[in-house]
Amino acid sequence: MRNVAKAGLVILGLAAMSASSLAATSNFVRPVANTLRAAEFGKTLPPIGYVDFCGRGEDECKFHGGKIEAQNVTSETWGQIEQVNKYVNTKIRPATDMELYHVADYWTYPVDAGDCEDYALLKKRYLQGLGFSADVLLMTVVLDENNEGHAVLTISTNKGDYVLDNRRREILRWDETGYTFLKRQSQIQANQWVSLQPVQPQASTIQIPVGTKSK
């Protein structure tokens, strides 16, 4: 993922742990099958990459939402979601932040290449351009099947939370992805994040490297 910094945000005492070591020391809760929406467990720290991104003054970080809890899905809106997911996955070439920017984590809107969080940011921008509310388009951090940090875009709908993923053509409901969901943007304010895991002693201070591998 890319780095995002909101002016005025100060993060102290962050633990530098790899995703694999984090998974080994914490009992994360995986999605329960047939659960339409991911449960939220209070505020948590945003990814450092996102904090840096916001610190560059990106409009993505400024919305104050909470007006719409879920997108009403019709055949038309679902078609738009599928088109955006396919277009971005096809247009953008996968590349790590280290390859592109010579840093471990850097969030930005990609032009022709990017890491997982860049795909998600661009999909969010395109969907907002089609009239979708930012309230339901949520940047999300997960652990993948290899317990590595990964970023996706969650869209909250009346049919459940669905995931737009640069690694997959199919748009799956969150509980069908095989991922462990850690945290995502708040629907109330973009630069606030909420935990998707029950409160744990170190949950609010751990930062997880995201997107060390693009594919």
Regions found by a protein language model. Give the residues of each.
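Bacterial N-terminal signal peptides that target proteins for export
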Residues: 1-9
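Generic extreme N-terminus detector
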Residues: 5, 18-21
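A structural boundary/capping signal
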Residues: 21-215
